[in-house]
């Protein structure tokens, strides 16, 4: 039967409770119940005057507003405020009633600029929520997955300028330099000159070398990232670590043009002391410096197979066998490549004899050198890379590496698809750190809240079942006693 009463209740006056308007299984309700939000007062206490000025907005409400934005992937703060005005669940979560005025969309931005800009407040919020996850024994940091994703910056690709910038130094450069000098001394070679005294251009792997790069005039702190063969954008690189259950353990933010292997140390320092036994990462982290760092710290590095960067039709490096006793390489034609020098990048160079190679039947498959000399390089920390290869072939490691798509890659996919992580509307690295910190806090807290809610439901079911069984047993015993008498 057709019923037409859509407009009858619009002007009714009703009495209701805000708490009754939000379903018991609503996401914001279980999130609000999962954690005590009063910890925010302790974090921001020193940012407010205790007895001067006008009464401020509640700091918990202030933090919850961007929390709603990142939790539901709302594109801007302006749109978030519009959603809060008409959404009862949002108002309930913020502690507002139906007649309270919603803060202006610039309120959070002004408070950020005046109070939170140069602080680590949002990282502390992320850490506090992670501690709650540890408290319930949900996090297992023995196997950690590390990867980086790029978030598009709010910068026009056409508004740029070229600048000369110094390349960031490798985090292990000082240790590598000592190792190079030690190796050259063992081979009776002179130590390398300092860069200031060297007439040659510094090597590409060392810090201090200058290079021309593209810089955005809108967001100079972002980096020019080559997204594909025909696509380049200004972006930020978000390096992230998570455990095998998908709990986010730490993160760092860098310009999009920084390589993952150069920025790894910052993330690794944040993860120190949590009990990592195995660290799983993609081929971008498969460098001797990282392998040495992990193995020396007692951590098992798990890296994938990396295809040799050799021209098609030429012998790959594995065809040249290294003789550890005589410190030389033997080519496929059983000729010796002897040690020549150790370069500034930490690679020992081994060269063949040009006169012998000139008559070699494999010359065209070996080298294109005009003087017929074959060059093979070996890093001073090559034994660490060989250990990584042995680990890769260990039973069970292939299956463990395959879990990346179920952990760190799924995490990135969820953040981009549902939490506005594909791009940022904010300018500057500091604001990007705020966005990443709150987004990852949302992901961890949402997962924690759902698991706690499921545990409560399970406990209530078990409690009801136990009471039912106890009642049945009591009735059974009573009937037996009555029958006996």
Regions found by a protein language model. Name each.
Residues 66, 73-86, 96-485:
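Anion-binding and metal-coordination hotspots
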Residues 24-67, 72-73, 380, 384:
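Basic, short loop/linker segments at the boundary and entry of helix-turn-helix/winged-helix-like folds
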Residues 11, 24, 37, 58, ...:
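Generic alpha-helical segment signature
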